[in-house]
From Swiss-Prot:
Carbohydrate attachment residues: 80, 214, 331, 456
Listed GO CC annotations: aggresome; cytoplasm; extracellular region; extracellular space; late endosome; lysosome; membrane
Function: Saposin-A and saposin-C stimulate the hydrolysis of glucosylceramide by beta-glucosylceramidase (EC 3.2.1.45) and galactosylceramide by beta-galactosylceramidase (EC 3.2.1.46). Saposin-C apparently acts by combining with the enzyme and acidic lipid to form an activated complex, rather than by solubilizing the substrate. Saposin-B stimulates the hydrolysis of galacto-cerebroside sulfate by arylsulfatase A (EC 3.1.6.8), GM1 gangliosides by beta-galactosidase (EC 3.2.1.23) and globotriaosylceramide by alpha-galactosidase A (EC 3.2.1.22). Saposin-B forms a solubilizing complex with the substrates of the sphingolipid hydrolases.
Keyword hit for Glycoprotein: yes
Signal peptide: 1-16
Protein's name according to its UniProt entry: Prosaposin
GO biological process: adenylate cyclase-inhibiting G protein-coupled receptor signaling pathway; antigen processing and presentation; cellular response to reactive oxygen species; ceramide metabolic process; cerebellar Purkinje cell differentiation; cochlea development; corneocyte development; cornified envelope assembly
UniProt xrefs under Pfam families: SapA, SapB_1, SapB_2
Organism per entry: Rattus norvegicus
Record key words, sorted: Disulfide bond, Glycoprotein, Lysosome, Repeat, Secreted, Signal
Main location: other
Residue ranges annotated for the Saposin B-type domain, each copy included: 59-142, 193-274, 310-391, 435-516
Propeptide: 17-59, 143-193, 274-309, 390-434, 517-554
Compartments reported by the entry: Lysosome
Length: 554
């Protein structure tokens, strides 16, 4: 009923203009269809509905309010409210208006034109803007744009340019700036060219100096670029920020390892005797197929960069494992050891630190249990892919290595399975993937979530990202992604709360195939020589006395 009261108020605003001269009916659609009162007087309601009021409308507050009220009025009619009841209520609403003249006008409008308006509402429930145009509360979009252009021409002022409209065409011209397709018709003056080159080199030098001397400069620059991303609109803004997060660090590193002259030559501000080789530009129609509509996310770090850091990771891992072995010998508590591992993980670079923390949270107790049974620390670093495996140790520690590898999220090649004793390691088999393609789409979706969600995200945040994540994948994957999320959402949500490693998550829920894997069993005698030979009692219990005498105790 509140909606009807608001509708009555809008009717007063729209229809209290003076009665028009009958000659106005010959003035054409623009005049006849300016409001419902004129259209009724000229008997042109149907004509106005078809030719004028049904056209797109400009966005405005009165128009939006009117559309809401008309929609609510239509809902009341659907609830079987009679026209007499609505008319009586509107007349009572008019009586509440304090201004006596407005109250009388309101009642006159309701009595005279409400049946026409209600008929329009019944017939055009899907387009409330048509009714609001008849009430002169919504303006035609075509008319609005024409008025704007005319006003700009008459003002004789230079309009302010929206930066967001300038950025996009500028970005599209960057390839032509880097690799011009045609030589300039006239060579620039040497002096001017030298000035531009010197200015470019000075700018790059100043930026490099600021990066070295001011620790907050890079972050400030990144924040400034993200502010510019906000001006690109809701859809492009998130993609822009995602690119900045992925590639800003790599871009700064590249700039710091290049000479200013080299950078300025690349962007075309400085000349070089040996010209920079030009790349063949891909036509825009072809390039956009690879970039849009999905802007596929890629890892910001190349594989060879990670491999170059493996030596450092290996040394750090060996140092940490040796220290933990010493603490175990000194009877340190498990809580103290876990804290020590967590601190060690935090000292690693970002990619390795995140992986280290995930492995620690999920499998920390199992790793410590293996260390307590005198497994070589260097070998342990090998099986978690931070060091190259030592071939001399593989033969003697094959079973515990297989157990550790199966507990880690990363899946190396499965080890050879030894002959199973009566009590052996538990066997687990991941069911084959369903629908033949969920493995690939699962990994792409988890990669998207990994890049766009903060660490320790809540279930609600992960669920919201899942619901819209499929729309950011390439077209061939979107339908399949929707089916995948619909089928696996509950299980996927439970795992993503704990870990977001694509290979681990997709294997865990069973959409990516995997070989039989050995899991760390409850029977300790399957842990291998590191456990069998710790003392004679354990060796006897595991039937390994002869083995320990030949290979360990000699």
């Amino acid at each position: 009923m509140y909606a009807l009261a608001l509708l009555a108020s809008l009717l007063v605003t729209a229809l209290t203009s003076p009665v028009q001269d009958p000659k106005i009916c010959s003035g054409g659609s623009a005049v006849v269809c300016r409001d419902v009162k004129t259209a009724v007087d000229c008997r042109a309601v149907k004509h106005c509905q078809q030719m004028v009021w049904s056209k797109p409308t400009a966005k405005s507050l009165p128009c939006d309010i009117c559309k809401t009220v008309v929609t609510e009025a239509g809902n009341l009619l659907k609830d079987n409210a009679t026209e007499e009841e609505i008319l009586h209520y509107l007349e009572k609403t008019c009586a509440w208006i304090h201004d006596s003249s407005l109250s009388a006008s309101c009642k006159e409008v309701v009595d005279s034109y409400l049946p026409v308006i209600l008929d329009m509402i019944k017939g055009e429930m899907s387009n409330p803007g048509e009714v609001c145009s008849a009430l002169n509360l919504c303006q035609s979009l075509q008319e609005y744009l024409a008025e704007q252009n005319q006003r700009q021409l008459e003002s004789n002022k230079i309009p302010e340019v929206d930066l967001a409209r300038v950025v996009a065409p500028f970005m599209s011209n960057i390839p032509l700036l880097l690799y011009p397709q045609d030589r300039p018709r006239s060579q620039p003056q040497p002096k001017a060219n030298e000035d531009v080159c010197q200015d470019c080199m000075k700018l790059v030098t100043d930026i490099q100096t600021a990066v070295r001397t001011n620790s907050s400069f890079v972050q400030g620059l990144v924040d400034h670029v993200k502010e510019d991303c906000d001006r690109l609109g809701p859809g492009v803004s998130d993609i822009c920020k995602n690119y900045v997060d992925q590639y800003s660090e790599v871009a700064v590193q590249m700039m710091m390892h290049m000479q200013p002259k080299e950078i300025c030559v690349m962007v075309g501000f400085c000349d070089e005797v040996k010209r920079v080789p030009m790349r063949t530009l891909v036509p825009a129609t072809e390039a956009i197929k690879n970039i849009l509509p999905a802007l596929e996310l890629t890892d910001p770090y190349e594989q060879d960069v990670i491999q170059a850091q493996n030596v450092i990771f290996c040394q750090v891992c060996q140092l940490v494992m040796r220290k933990l072995s010493e603490l175990i010998i000194n009877n340190a508590t498990e809580e103290l050891l876990i804290k020590g591992l967590s601190k060690a993980c935090s000292l690693l670079p970002a990619p390795a630190s995140t992986k280290c923390q995930e492995v620690l949270v999920t499998f920390g107790p199992s790793l410590l249990d293996v260390l307590m049974h005198e497994v070589n620390p260097n070998f342990l670093c090998g099986v978690i892919s931070l060091c190259s495996a030592n071939p001399n140790l593989v033969g003697t520690l094959e079973q515990p290595a297989a157990a550790i590898v199966s507990a880690l999220p990363k899946e190396p090649a499965p080890p050879k399975q030894p002959e199973e004793p009566k009590q052996s390691a538990l066997r687990a088999h991941v069911p084959p993937q369903k629908n033949g393609g969920f493995c690939e789409v699962c990994k792409k979706l988890v990669i998207y979530l990994e890049h766009n969600l903060e660490k320790n995200s809540t279930k609600e945040e992960i669920l919201a990202a899942l619901e819209k994540g499929c729309s950011f994948l390439p077209d061939p994957y979107q339908k399949q992604c929707d089916e995948f999320v619909a089928e696996y959402e509950p299980l996927l949500l439970e795992i993503l709360v704990e870990v977001m490693d694509p290979s681990f998550v997709c294997s865990k829920i069973g959409v990516c195939p995997s070989a039989y894997k050995l899991l760390l069993g409850t029977e300790k005698c399957v842990w291998g020589p590191g456990y069998w030979c710790q003392n004679s009692e354990t060796a006897a219990r595991c039937n390994a006395v002869d083995h320990c005498k030949r290979h360990v105790w000699n």
